[in-house]
């Protein structure tokens, strides 16, 4: 559907037992007698291919069967029954033979204790492996993945499985409930090899069990290998954050990026929501006494909300009942089953009851039988699977047209906006995501009418398949009975199956479009947050305006407010105000002006460009840039802004925020709610819950990967670090204010509310500037003489005691020696400090050389000599962990990976729309990226659009060729003008290259 590339799915064996559950045909039986009488008939289906059994070994005449320990003794001629004890149960459940005993599912009291009987083939004197429908819960007490209770940090909690990949037989099982070393598939993967999870890790046991395996379904929907999905589920179950997983558990997720990991997380939450909804619906139907075994099976098979709605709709409270239910209540289900099983013995005349409504005439009886058959067909699993597969191969299109409503009810402007979709038709496999969102918006505004069109060939082939295969009577049926069956098929398709398919198609298209829109918003937000900062400059922020003037704010290189003012540039006082601006720039030695892109931006830009061209600010070489002021006005009146800038007018706060967005974009933009930054598409039409979760996750990812200096960062920035929240950030700031700066990372354990898990998640993303600490330590040495030199904090420096505090849970009190650790300024996690020290010893380096050129030279020469894999094996760690250690030791103390991103585009002159000509080549900055094109600011007051068809991989550098096609807000591009529509202020551009 989307033109964007998808990951290739690796073929694996089925995780779920091949258990074709019985069809939905027995739903809502009229009585127990009817069920018993007609239970022998089932729709025709292909007989499953039985597993080949090895011939039983012939026992010797004089030899008794060998009795194994803890196994029942088996006499000659009897079949072996495998006995398996369920967890937390004192009763053993016997597995029945696959060929002889197939029937009923045990009655379930509660969904959480429901277990499906396992089946195995009979074989004398041997215990066969049993198929598992659901993932078993591990019997041993699972401890946390990271060993939170340990006082000393462990180097790593995951190891690469270095053994030979074993090729499993086709009939082997694939489960995640037992030893990962035995059960995880081991195929050749392009990015990595399967990595075993620690034996003490939590299993993938789900709270609500279904008739499908969570790992397998998650793998199918995300196109990610099952062993990776199993590891991801365990990681999320252990409350690990995405930034922590991406950086420190990369080997467990096969090098997935943050977007892919976030997609898996969202899909997992959706599946769990469906399972919980199924559970609650089952409990509700049970209370009403309407539950049957077939209905329970059908509901446990549901994987989407649409499937659950289709199955449970007739059983909702207050429902009048379906036509099929009313026919069953009249006792016609036996006739419907007889038509399929024994049509020669069926006499519909015997069902006539003149005094009963619905049975008074032969026609009423035929209609009742037709409704029952239609319901059976529409709820049969194999039938629905066939029609879904058939639709995937045939032409199914979505159509939209202008709604037939009076012009008074619809705004004419809205009608013009949807001109492209008033006579629109497209195959559902080819339609773009933004088109789906546009059609949905038009439908919500009652401008468009939307329908899904399934070709007639689908219906014809479906009916032919039903008559000849699935629903074919078992013996000769008279013409009048075949007519009823034909009518039932047509009625089932038109009244039940077709609407269900339409709902499923629309829901799937909308869900995919919303997810892609949210992901695009997240990519744009990440690109904007990671804009390269412009440190070390004094900046003037300008919030443009007409009547109320332009608000000015001058900030220092450390973001301190130096001066604020208001000038009126567009009220005939421009020349007089120019002198004031020049005086301010000269007094504060400021040569950079930052203009917000709001009201009067174009006029303000022209004003400064004219003064710069006249060299009015000499001797200063003044330049200016335009930045987005989205969200600045909302932030200026927020409690955070009032706390940060008390007593300052909200309008002037906006000017301060605009200037700081250039000096440190990340630190300023995190103060604003992400959805107000305005770099998305149809953001008000998508799920707000999904949007907020995704954007908050992107902010956490960006802040964590950039890192924060814990001794100078703000509370707002700190709360977005992985593992922290508003309360923990507040406690950290309070501890810092009370006890002074943090000397090392170990002191974080002394902060209230920061437990072992929170410390594990946040420690690697928190930096402690060593220059700042050395200055502080030297001052402390002069006064107390407690700190001497620089030492490494190790487990020996930490004393751990358990102190009980009244009735509260005992909390570990950590007494940390106040010794700086140069590794605390790096991205190396404390759990890997021991490995880092051993690596330093191997290369002959010291902690004093961290981040210096000498360290880089030693590392490079050692790597050339030994190689990464050999070094990792010697240090008993993974290649990914070793790479993090190498990066941390070699990167300079002031390293900021945002410097690789584009900086704001500083200008000295302005160009008008009328000055453009077709073919003109310009440089511009990406303003927003959508699913249909890229908006680029080329400095003419109106953004131009690069259609998505003009953004090809050939025009991108190798580093830019990623899923988002490498274009996001802030990136500089070279474009060519293709078309200019001055009346509509539209500019069409072609991408030449990314600068």
Swiss-Prot record:
PROSITE patterns: S1
SMART domains: S1, YqgFc
GO molecular function ontology, one term from the record: structural constituent of ribosome
SUPFAM superfamilies named among the record's database cross-references: Nucleic acid-binding proteins, Ribonuclease H-like, RuvA domain 2-like, Tex N-terminal region-like
CDD domains: S1_Tex
A biological-process GO annotation: translation
Modified residues (Phosphoserine): 861, 964
Residue span(s) of domain S1 motif: 919-992
Keywords for the protein's UniProt record, in alphabetical order: Coiled coil, Isopeptide bond, Phosphoprotein, RNA-binding, Ubl conjugation
Entry coiled-coil feature ranges: 258-288
Cross-link Glycyl lysine isopeptide (Lys-Gly) (interchain with G-Cter in SUMO2): where in chain: 84, 134, 166-167, 183, 185, 955
InterPro entries in alphabetical order: HHH_9, NA-bd_OB-fold, Ribos_protein_bS1-like, RNaseH-like_sf, RuvA_2-like, S1_domain, S1_Tex, Tex-like_central_region
Statement: the UniProt record of this protein carries the keyword Nuclease: no
Biased composition (Low complexity): 146-159
Region (Disordered): 23-81, 120-165
Cross-link Glycyl lysine isopeptide (Lys-Gly) (interchain with G-Cter in SUMO1) placement: 185
Record-linked PANTHER family: 30S RIBOSOMAL PROTEIN S1, S1 RNA-BINDING DOMAIN-CONTAINING PROTEIN 1
Name of the molecule in the record: S1 RNA-binding domain-containing protein 1
Organism: Homo sapiens (Human)
Encoding gene, per UniProt annotation: SRBD1
């Amino acid at each position: 559907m989307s033109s964007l590339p998808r990951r290739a799915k690796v073929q694996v064996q089925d995780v779920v037992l091949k258990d074709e559950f019985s069809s939905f045909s027995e739903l809502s039986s009229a009585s127990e007698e009817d069920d018993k009488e007609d239970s022998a008939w089932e729709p025709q289906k292909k007989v499953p291919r039985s597993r080949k059994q090895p011939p039983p070994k012939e026992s010797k005449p004089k030899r008794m069967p060998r009795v194994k320990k803890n196994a029942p003794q088996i006499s000659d001629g009897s079949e072996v029954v495998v006995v398996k004890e369920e967890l937390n149960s004192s009763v053993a459940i016997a597995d029945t033979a696959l060929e002889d005993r197939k029937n009923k599912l045990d009655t379930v009291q509660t969904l959480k204790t429901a277990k499906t009987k396992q089946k195995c083939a009979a074989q004398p004197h041997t215990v066969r492996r049993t198929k598992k429908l659901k993932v078993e819960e591990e019997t041993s007490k699972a401890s946390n993945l990271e060993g939170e209770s340990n006082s000393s940090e462990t180097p790593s909690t995951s190891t690469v499985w270095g053994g030979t990949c074993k090729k499993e037989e086709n009939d082997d099982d694939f489960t995640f409930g037992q030893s990962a070393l035995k059960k995880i598939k081991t195929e050749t993967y392009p990015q990595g090899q399967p990595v075993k999870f620690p034996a003490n890790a939590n299993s993938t046991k789900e709270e609500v069990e279904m008739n499908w395996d969570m790992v397998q379904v998650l793998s199918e929907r995300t196109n990610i290998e099952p062993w990776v999905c199993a590891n991801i589920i365990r990681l999320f179950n252990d409350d690990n954050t995405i930034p922590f997983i991406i950086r420190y558990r990369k080997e467990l997720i096969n090098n997935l990026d943050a977007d892919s990991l976030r997609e898996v997380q969202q899909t997992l939450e959706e599946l769990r929501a469906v399972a919980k909804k199924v559970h609650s619906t089952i409990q509700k139907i049970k209370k009403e006494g309407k539950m049957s075994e077939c209905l329970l099976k059908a509901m446990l098979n549901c994987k989407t909300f649409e499937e659950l709605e289709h199955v449970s709709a007739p059983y909702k409270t207050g429902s009048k009942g379906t036509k099929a239910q009313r026919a069953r209540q009249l006792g016609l289900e036996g006739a419907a089953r007889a038509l399929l099983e024994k049509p020669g013995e069926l006499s519909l005349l015997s069902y006539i009851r003149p005094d009963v409504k619905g049975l008074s005439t032969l026609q009423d009886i035929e209609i009742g039988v037709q409704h029952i058959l239609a319901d059976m067909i529409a709820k049969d699993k194999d039938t629905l699977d066939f029609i879904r597969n058939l639709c995937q191969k045939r032409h199914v299109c979505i159509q939209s047209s202008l709604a037939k409503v009076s012009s008074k009810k619809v705004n004419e402007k809205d009608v013009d906006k949807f001109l492209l979709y008033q006579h629109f038709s497209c195959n559902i496999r080819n339609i773009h995501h933004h088109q789906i969102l546009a059609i949905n918006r038009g439908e919500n505004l009652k401008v468009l009418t939307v329908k899904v069109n399934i070709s007639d060939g689908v219906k014809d082939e479906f009916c032919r398949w039903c008559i000849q295969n699935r629903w074919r009577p078992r013996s000769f049926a008279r013409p009048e009975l075949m007519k009823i069956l034909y009518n039932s098929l047509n009625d089932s398709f038109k009244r039940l199956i077709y609407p269900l398919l339409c709902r499923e198609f629309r829901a799937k298209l909308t869900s995919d479009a919303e997810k892609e829109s949210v992901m695009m918003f997240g990519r744009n937000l990440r690109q904007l947050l990671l804009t390269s900062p412009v440190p070390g400059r004094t900046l003037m922020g300008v919030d443009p305006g007409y009547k109320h003037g332009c608000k000015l704010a001058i900030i220092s290189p450390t973001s301190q407010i130096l001066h604020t003012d208001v000038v009126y540039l567009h009220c005939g006082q421009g020349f007089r105000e120019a002198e004031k601006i020049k005086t301010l720039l000269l007094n504060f030695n400021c040569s950079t002006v930052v203009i917000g892109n709001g009201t009067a931006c174009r006029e303000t830009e022209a004003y400064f460009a004219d003064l710069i061209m006249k060299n009015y600010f000499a001797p200063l070489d003044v330049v200016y840039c335009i930045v987005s002021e989205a969200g600045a006005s909302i932030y200026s009146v927020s409690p955070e802004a009032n706390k940060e800038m008390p007593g300052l007018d909200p309008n002037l706060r906006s000017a301060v925020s605009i200037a700081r967005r250039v000096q440190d974009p990340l630190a300023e933009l995190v103060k604003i709610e992400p959805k107000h930054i305005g770099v998305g598409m149809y953001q008000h039409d998508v799920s707000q819950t999904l949007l907020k979760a995704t954007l908050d996750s992107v902010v956490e990812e960006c802040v964590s990967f950039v890192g924060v200096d814990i001794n100078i960062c703000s509370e707002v920035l700190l709360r977005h670090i992985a593992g922290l929240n508003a309360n923990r950030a507040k406690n950290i700031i309070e501890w810092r204010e009370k006890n002074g700066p943090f000397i090392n990372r170990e002191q974080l354990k002394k902060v209230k509310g920061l437990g072992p898990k929170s410390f594990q998640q946040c420690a690697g993303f928190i930096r402690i500037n060593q220059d700042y600490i050395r200055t502080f330590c030297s001052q402390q040495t002069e006064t107390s003489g407690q700190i001497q030199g620089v030492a490494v904090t190790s487990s020996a420096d930490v004393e751990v005691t358990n102190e009980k505090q009244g009735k509260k849970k005992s909390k570990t009190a950590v007494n940390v020696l106040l010794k700086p650790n140069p590794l605390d300024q790096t991205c190396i996690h404390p759990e890997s400090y021991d490995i880092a020290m051993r690596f330093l010893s191997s290369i002959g380096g010291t902690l004093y050389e961290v981040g210096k050129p000498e360290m880089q030279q030693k590392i490079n020469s050692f790597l050339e000599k030994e190689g990464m894999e050999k070094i990792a094996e010697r240090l008993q760690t993974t290649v990914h962990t070793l790479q993090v250690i190498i990066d941390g030791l070699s990167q300079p103390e002031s390293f900021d990976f945002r410097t690789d991103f584009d900086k704001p585009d500083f200008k000295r002159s302005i160009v008008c729309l009328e000055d453009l000509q077709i073919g003109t080549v310009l440089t511009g900055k990406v303003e927003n990226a959508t699913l249909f094109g890229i908006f680029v600011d080329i400095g003419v007051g109106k953004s131009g659009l690069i259609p998505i068809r003009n953004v090809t991989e050939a025009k991108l550098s190798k580093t830019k060729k990623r899923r988002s096609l490498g274009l996001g807000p802030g990136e500089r591009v070279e474009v060519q003008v293709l078309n200019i529509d001055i009346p509509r202020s539209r500019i069409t551009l072609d991408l030449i290259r990314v600068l």
